[in-house]
């Protein structure tokens, strides 16, 4: 299994959590972003910088991801593409996406985007905080314990 990190919006609070697991499990990891992102120093991490542009990092992740790989991303359409390749995806708040739930999350995301575009609602999700990092750590570590 390879771990992929969609680095474009990766929260700083998650970096030490993920780095500890990468080191503990000697987990091959690719951090992909359109700018330099530093998760930490590890011989198990490869940093890949893609061209600027919408979804360039997403396209590279999809190209490289294989069955049973894990992608950390807050991008639900990217998670959907990974699931369709028989990969796994987890978001920054610890939600593990699956074939059973990804379409529901995608539909909700699209609905909320439409509501925001209509002006009926502004803003996005609440700010990321320590409770979110804790939920992520629990789900991430449980996934790794089961799959590594």
UniProtKB/Swiss-Prot annotation:
InterPro entries: UPF0178. CDD domains: PIN_YqxD-like. Pfam families: DUF188 (PF02639). Belongs to the UPF0178 family. This is UPF0178 protein SUN_1096.
């Amino acid at each position: 299994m390879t771990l992929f990190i969609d680095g474009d919006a990766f929260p700083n609070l998650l970096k030490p959590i993920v780095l500890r697991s990468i080191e503990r499990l000697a987990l091959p990891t690719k951090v992909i972003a359109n700018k330099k992102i530093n998760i930490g120093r590890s011989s198990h991490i490869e940093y890949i910088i893609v061209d600027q542009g919408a979804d360039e990092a997403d396209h590279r992740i999809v190209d490289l991801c294989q069955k049973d790989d894990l992608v950390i991303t807050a991008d639900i359409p990217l998670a959907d593409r990974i699931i369709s390749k028989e990969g796994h995806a987890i978001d920054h708040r610890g939600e593990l996406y699956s074939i059973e739930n990804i379409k529901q999350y995608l539909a909700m995301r699209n609905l909320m985007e439409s509501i925001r575009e209509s002006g009926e609602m502004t803003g996005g999700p609440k700010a990321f905080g320590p409770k979110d990092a804790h939920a992520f750590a629990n789900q991430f570590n449980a996934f790794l314990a089961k799959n590594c």
